[in-house]
C-alpha cells in the first residue's frame, strides 16, 4: 500500500502541467475583447490573447499570475502578445 501511495505521488509530481493548461487557446465566436492569458504548450509559457467572451475553455486566465500559478510556470520576461 505504501508503494502505491509513493508511486502516485511521484507520478503526480512528474506529470507537472495541469491538464487544463494543455488545452488549445480558444478565442471564441463572440466579439467582446477581454484581455486574457493562456498556457502555450509549444513555448511553455503563459501568453496574452484577446478572448471574445463566449465559447472558451479552461485554458483561459484573467491574469498572468493566475496562469503561471495554475500551469506551474515561472515568469521569464513579459508575456508574448497574440
Curated annotation (Swiss-Prot):
Site (Reactive bond): 31-32
A Pfam family this chain is assigned to: Kunitz_BPTI
Location of the BPTI/Kunitz inhibitor domain: 21-71
Annotated keywords: Disulfide bond, Nematocyst, Protease inhibitor, Secreted, Serine protease inhibitor, Signal
Top-rank taxon, per record: Eukaryota
Originating species: Anemonia viridis (Snakelocks anemone)
Family (UniProt): Belongs to the venom Kunitz-type family. Sea anemone type 2 potassium channel toxin subfamily.
Broad class of the protein's primary localization: secreted
Taxonomic lineage: Eukaryota, Metazoa, Cnidaria, Anthozoa, Hexacorallia
Signal peptide region: 1-16
Function: Serine protease inhibitor that inhibits both tissue and plasma kallikreins. Has hemolytic activity. Inhibits voltage-gated potassium channels (Kv).
Compartments it resides in: Secreted; Nematocyst
Disulfide bridges in this chain: 21-71, 30-54, 46-67
The protein's name in its UniProt record: KappaPI-actitoxin-Avd3e
Keyword Secreted: yes
PROSITE patterns: BPTI_KUNITZ_1 (PS00280), BPTI_KUNITZ_2 (PS50279)
MF GO annotations: serine-type endopeptidase inhibitor activity
Residue stretch(es) of the prosequence: 76-82
Matches recorded under InterPro entries: Kunitz_BPTI, Kunitz_BPTI_sf, Prtase_inh_Kunz-CS, TFPI/VKTCI-like
GO CC term (a single one): extracellular region
